[in-house]
Regions:
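Chalcogenol-based redox active-site neighborhoods
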Residues: 1-165
Length: 165
């Protein structure tokens, strides 16, 4: 694991990455990019949460908990982003697969791919030996300042309600 977390009250590490999104109007899943700089320019807050990997057993529970609360994040002028070290193609395949068959189905927020491990490393959540991230949640204000962080081991879930609060 990387041993240095970003510091509270300081600028969050900038990121830019490929994401997979679902367009509910067109009913299609597509690739896009996202960056913290662009979100800051739009004067929005960001919740960036890391999860260990696609197609795992605990991750869908949290991912769907975040999805059920998407309106709360939007009401708070906040962009929600899920991130793992999987590829964008893995994210897409997972999103295309129904929940009943081990997928996550369509989400109302993007999943960011970090196969280079760069983003997970910059946020201090990379488990180098596994090539995956811990369960980290980072709240970044509309000026790019890190306001909150919480990191859990891979096998321990997080409280989405606490993140919304």
């Amino acid at each position: 694991m990387s041993n240095s977390f970003p510091r509270l009250g300081k600028p969050a590490p900038l990121f830019e990455g490929d994401v997979v999104r679902f367009d509910s109007r067109k009913k299609e899943i597509f690739f896009d990019t996202i960056s913290l700089n662009k979100i800051i320019e739009e004067k929005k807050w960001t919740v960036l949460f890391f999860y260990p990997r696609d197609f795992s057993s605990l991750c869908p529970t949290e991912i769907h908990s975040f999805n059920r609360r998407i309106k709360d994040f939007e009401k708070a002028n906040c962009v929600l982003i899920g991130c793992s070290t999987d590829s964008k193609n893995s994210h897409k395949a997972w999103m295309e697969k129904p929940r009943t068959k081990g997928g996550i189905d369509k989400l109302s927020y993007p999943l960011m791919a970090d196969p280079s491990l760069r983003i997970a490393r910059s946020y201090g959540v990379l488990q180098r030996e596994l090539g995956q991230a811990l369960r980290g949640t980072f709240v970044i204000n509309d000026e790019g300042i890190l306001m909150s962080l919480a990191v859990n081991p891979s096998k321990i879930g997080r409280s989405v309600d606490e993140t919304v609060r």
